[in-house]
């Protein structure tokens, strides 16, 4: 391990501000009102307000990574007679399928392939053919490829068919404007270390209270019981059932302040979009091609085809970039040789320009 700090060009954990890091220098007592009422309850309220201005929603914080919250929702929201349609076009949709299988939850997996956007007409046909489906679950920003999925159109279907709608917005909430009530979302799942630009340690669920109240006694897990976590926070003014990740929570509270100072989600989205467009233009000028067509891209992360030169090795390319202070992501696409570059976190236009210069220097196979 080196003491040198790198610019993380990843979908999270990501580069955070100095002030977010400094917020973790304070030690909090998990029983103290200053922490539970003054910090946790404020975060819950702010998250709900970021998600929608409509009444009837609440926020629940849960220890662990984003996948813990996804599993908590699936394991708590679906009863023994329920069935979920899981829309999958990448590793994170596939992870939901795996979770449902391990928990014994009835499910229909619609997998449209990693480089295709889900076909809304195909989803319509599945719902029409199988009235036993009670829930729909899908990923918004699929970071396997950088695909942005059509949660608005699928939400319209969920509303029309009367289905409970679960959206994994891990790498989009806080970075892409949305109104979850208008999108007919019943459960939105995200994480502290993504677009709000906090650090890892907890995830959160923003849910329709009426749906959440119906989850009592359903959970397949003690620790991941979403209803029990919600009731504990409601009844005890922000207290967590089990040990709260206090330092991460303080960092997140600071990150929310910095999101507001930047101008809110709309301003952050604009920065992310400009970062991504500048990155793609610069990479194409260097001879790299994107895995996806431009209209399919999210402003979060972009997958690029690896060079076909026989001398190219991702490990060597990565090492040379890291020496210059930049960390990128390996590929996760099963059918294509790719690498990925994220552009969220404390990343600005000057950073993208510096990255492109570093990439040019690191292209040893062209020398």
From Swiss-Prot:
Record EC number: 2.6.1.37
Reactions the enzyme catalyzes: (2-aminoethyl)phosphonate + pyruvate = phosphonoacetaldehyde + L-alanine
Entry keyword Magnesium = no
Per UniProt, the enzyme's principal EC class comes to transferase
Entry keyword set: Aminotransferase, Pyridoxal phosphate, Pyruvate, Transferase
Q: Which coenzymes or cofactors are required?
A: pyridoxal 5'-phosphate
Residue ranges crossing the lipid bilayer per the database entry: none
The molecular function GO annotations come to: 2-aminoethylphosphonate-pyruvate transaminase activity
- Residue positions where N6-(pyridoxal phosphate)lysine is found in the record: 194
According to its UniProt entry, one GO biological process term is:
organic phosphonate catabolic process
What's the subunit arrangement here? Answer: Homodimer.
Could you tell me what this protein does? Involved in phosphonate degradation.
Protein family per UniProt: Belongs to the class-V pyridoxal-phosphate-dependent aminotransferase family. PhnW subfamily.
The name this protein carries in UniProt is 2-aminoethylphosphonate--pyruvate transaminase
Source gene? phnW
